[in-house]
Amino acid sequence: MVKQERKIQTSSTKKEMPLSSSPSSSSSSSSSSSSSSCKNKNKKSKIKKYKGVRMRSWGSWVSEIRAPNQKTRIWLGSYSTAEAAARAYDVALLCLKGPQANLNFPTSSSSHHLLDNLLDENTLLSPKSIQRVAAQAANSFNHFAPTSSAVSSPSDHDHHHDDGMQSLMGSFVDNHVSLMDSTSSWYDDHNGMFLFDNGAPFNYSPQLNSTTMLDEYFYEDADIPLWSFN
């Protein structure tokens, strides 16, 4: 009888052991999932956010801006870095709003070069001209950005970038980029043409890099809220 009771007690303890170990295994799995979620949140928080810029699922950065008082969004391009996309947005915003624009890089003197060379308070660029200026400004930023093999101070980088932007904007003046008065109609929706301030048609189609302009140049969308101009 004693031997049978001992066997019964031993078998019962063996059955109870997995039940006692289950809470620890569940707690370890929950802790691992929480730690992974924390890591993902930390990665997202480390990414600097710029106005007019969003990241796509495959890692590229896109920029677009809404034309004031219109349903039109102007596509500014797809870039390898958030900074380049933010530069494109800044230049486009300067074209639309002038000196009062709230920029991603307000301390950059290249913004003032743009205003001095192209803009005044009463002029606006056509949508595709804005696309071209923004894309070339972003490409200029990438061209003058320091590489890992070259060591330079931030002031040196700003100096080279400003020189590049100054040269870039000067080339647009030399090529007679169309400027139009803000009171005139700058785009004819019916005929798909841009207009000079005297109403003459202007079919502007710059040859942009296909890797930069991946989507439609601009498109209509009244319901989706876009980035604030303030």
UniProtKB/Swiss-Prot annotation:
Presence of keyword DNA-binding: yes
DNA-binding region: 49-106
Entry function: Transcriptional activator involved in the regulation of plant development and tolerance to abiotic stresses. Involved in salt and osmotic stress response pathways. May be regulated by the stress-related genes RD29A, RD22, DREB1A or P5CS during stress response. Binds to the GCC-box pathogenesis-related promoter element. May be involved in the regulation of gene expression by stress factors and by components of stress signal transduction pathways.
Cellular compartments per GO CC: nucleus
Biased composition regions of type Low complexity, renumbered to the chain: 20-39
Source organism of this protein record: Arabidopsis thaliana
Alphabetical UniProt keywords: Activator, DNA-binding, Ethylene signaling pathway, Nucleus, Stress response, Transcription, Transcription regulation
Protein name: Ethylene-responsive transcription factor ERF012
Induction behaviour: Induced by jasmonate (JA) and ethylene. Down-regulated by freezing and heat stresses.
